[in-house]
């Protein structure tokens, strides 16, 4: 009887090992796919006619008074009403030249090459660039 039970245990172990041999690669592929999708997040803006635009197609700008790579924006209050920030979601993860700064109110804003990005409230439609050079402090966001 001992030989028969050892044989049965060995046969059971081989079945489990065989199942693991096929399941392990599938689990690994699934895990790598999940990691890749987290790391390969879509950029928050695209390029149109040489400048960055938001998902709504509206032109994005940088503010000369923002200190590059400071991690914050100096355009708050009435400034942010006229120059709405390109907001980042709570789960957005920056990569490459994209970063996220924390605003005075605790909200998150996208930045490119360390400069926070903004829309101009007076741009009426996609493609407008009326904020470029405003007060000699606002610039088109370029790649």
Model feature map: region roles:
Residues 1-13:
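Short, Lys/Arg-enriched N-terminal segments with co-localized hydrophobic residues
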Residues 13-24:
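Bacterial N-terminal signal peptides that target proteins for export
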Residues 43-58, 102-115:
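Short, low-complexity cationic-aromatic patches
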Residues 64-69, 122-126:
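Acidic glycine-/aspartate-rich tracts in secreted/extracellular proteins
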Residues 72-99, 136-141:
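A low-complexity, Ser/Thr/Gly/Pro-enriched, surface-exposed linker/loop concept
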Residues 119-133:
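Short, exposed beta-strand-loop hairpins at the edges of beta-sheets
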